[in-house]
Amino acid sequence: MAETRSSPEERRPGGILRAAAVSRQFEGVRALERVTLELHRHEVVGLIGPNGAGKTTLVNLITGFDFPSSGTVELEEIDITAWPPHRRSRAGLARTFQQGHVFRGLTVRENVEVSALGVGARPTEARRRSEGLLGMLGLAQRAEQQAAVLPHGEERLLGVARALASEPRFLLMDEPAAGLHEAEVAEFAEVVRRVRDEHETGVLLIDHNIGLIMGVCDRIHVLDQGKTLAEGTPADVRRNVDVAAAYLGRRNGEGAE
């Protein structure tokens, strides 16, 4: 298979992933209103908010599965607003999905290799990435098993391995802890830290598990009714009265647990 490389412009090192004043309107309903979010490499940013706050809409705009009504999406100072998902992937932007997004008819190893091949890696390089990622995520013993037989928690990890196989500089994780039990959530938190620290990847983590968000994120961005409600460190967000009222179920200035 011939190796396909993205252009130097699309692989500029370093930088920031930025959604700048993005809005999205559906048939007269404004799902997002002038939201700005920045993600740097080597950090984890949490994105939280009530159901319907606009979290998945924002992720779709950033990853190219939808396009903003106004505003821009920028990857390392390049305007990628009109780029399709595959071009963003080759430029260093990856995403995991709520349902895992794995090929159930392939082996665990093949799932990861296909992702690497999809961004232009040669077969030998795809195998190297697969072996390294499966080892890091504790899936090496599952390498030759069909993805269809994986339990839920391991299927989520395979989704992460597939995303990392493209060697992204920025990774968006959509509800990765959904359906995981407490011990699996703790293990997953360590995976997120390793992705940030060992791969020097910026991670945008979208999840309803507040314990995970507070425990692993460097910064948190809160959406409510399509608008930015608050942003800051976990401690800042925990103390924010508006967040407590809108999302964490607290009133009258009490801090969230």
Feature map (PLM): residue ranges:
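Glycine-rich phosphate-binding loops of nucleotide-dependent enzymes
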Residues: 2-257
